[in-house]
């Protein structure tokens, strides 16, 4: 990668950001690396980078058409995309529609419990602290975001959830929950950043009733369920088919 991307700006668990000739544009390379439990578990999922990049590009581009401002510019290779340079807000926004994962552990809710309304949560983006759950008052205390920005994040999160629930339902996939990140561009405008993929969403196959077979996301890696590549491939195929169908109707 170095001969093509001479200046690495940032490397995370799943992606690498490189500078481009335009200071307002970055190139994102999606890796095949897989991590779970705050990088305590590590592995490789063959082809994950290409699949996540393609899925994220399709979803971000579609969300743009629905009025959600994102950092996405274009997909340049199977595992690379150009994005607008943003300053990432140090908060992860999680939206939950069905109880799963940490929500079950922390509340005692049974996995699969349908929530009466979407639950929006905010986590501090800090690996050293274990990405702790934050109350709104703690967010204000830490001065991570302004009250106005917090209201915007909440609004965007719920709008994105409603849009993606409908989109995935047409793919015969249930959107259980998902994590998103936001950043601000040089004008201070908040943009949806990072990615939306099986790495950042819990997705259950509506055509499967078995609780293990229906899992189509990184829980297959977390829980050693196997067939990870096949699950990601299925998500990619259904997402691209749905995008193509929507484009044909436009």
From Swiss-Prot:
It catalyses: 5-amino-1-(5-phospho-D-ribosyl)imidazole-4-carboxylate + L-aspartate + ATP = (2S)-2-[5-amino-1-(5-phospho-beta-D-ribosyl)imidazole-4-carboxamido]succinate + ADP + phosphate + 2 H(+). Pathway: Purine metabolism; IMP biosynthesis via de novo pathway; 5-amino-1-(5-phospho-D-ribosyl)imidazole-4-carboxamide from 5-amino-1-(5-phospho-D-ribosyl)imidazole-4-carboxylate: step 1/2. Keywords: ATP-binding, Ligase, Nucleotide-binding, Purine biosynthesis. It comes from the Bacteria. Its EC number is 6.3.2.6. GO terms for molecular function: ATP binding; phosphoribosylaminoimidazolesuccinocarboxamide synthase activity. Pfam families: SAICAR_synt. It is an enzyme of class 6 (ligase). One of its GO terms (biological process) is cobalamin biosynthetic process. InterPro entries: SAICAR_synt/ADE2_N, SAICAR_synt_PurC, SAICAR_synth, SAICAR_synthetase, SAICAR_synthetase_CS. Gene3D superfamilies: ATP-grasp fold, B domain, Phosphorylase Kinase, domain 1. HAMAP family: SAICAR_synth. Belongs to the SAICAR synthetase family. PANTHER family: MULTIFUNCTIONAL PROTEIN ADE2, SI:DKEY-6E2.2. This is Phosphoribosylaminoimidazole-succinocarboxamide synthase. It comes from Picosynechococcus sp. (strain ATCC 27264 / PCC 7002 / PR-6) (Agmenellum quadruplicatum). The lineage of its organism: Bacteria, Bacillati, Cyanobacteriota, Cyanophyceae, Oscillatoriophycideae.
């Amino acid at each position: 990668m170095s001969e093509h991307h001479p200046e690495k700006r940032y490397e995370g668990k799943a992606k690498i950001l490189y500078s481009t000739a335009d200071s307002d544009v970055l190139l994102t390379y999606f890796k095949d690396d897989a991590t779970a439990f705050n990088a305590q578990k590590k592995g490789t999922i063959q082809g994950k980078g290409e699949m996540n990049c393609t899925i994220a590009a399709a979803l971000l581009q579609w969300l743009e058409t629905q009025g959600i401002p994102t950092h996405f510019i274009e997909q340049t290779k199977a595992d690379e995309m150009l994005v607008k340079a943003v300053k990432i807000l140090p908060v992860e926004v999680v939206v939950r529609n069905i109880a799963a994962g940490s929500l079950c552990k922390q509340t005692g809710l049974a996995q699969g419990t349908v929530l009466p309304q979407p639950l929006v949560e905010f986590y501090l983006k800090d690996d050293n602290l274990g990405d702790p759950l934050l109350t709104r008052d703690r967010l204000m205390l830490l001065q991570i975001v302004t009250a106005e920005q917090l209201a915007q994040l909440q609004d965007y999160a719920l709008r994105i959830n409603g849009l993606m629930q409908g989109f995935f339902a047409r793919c015969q996939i249930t959107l259980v929950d998902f994590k998103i990140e936001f950043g601000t561009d040089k004008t201070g405008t908040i943009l949806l950043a990072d990615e939306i993929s099986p790495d950042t969403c819990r997705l259950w196959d509506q055509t499967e009733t078995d609780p293990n077979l229906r899992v189509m996301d990184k829980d297959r890696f977390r829980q050693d369920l196997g067939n990870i590549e096949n699950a990601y491939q299925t998500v990619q195929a259904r997402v691209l088919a749905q995008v193509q169908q929507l484009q044909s109707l436009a």
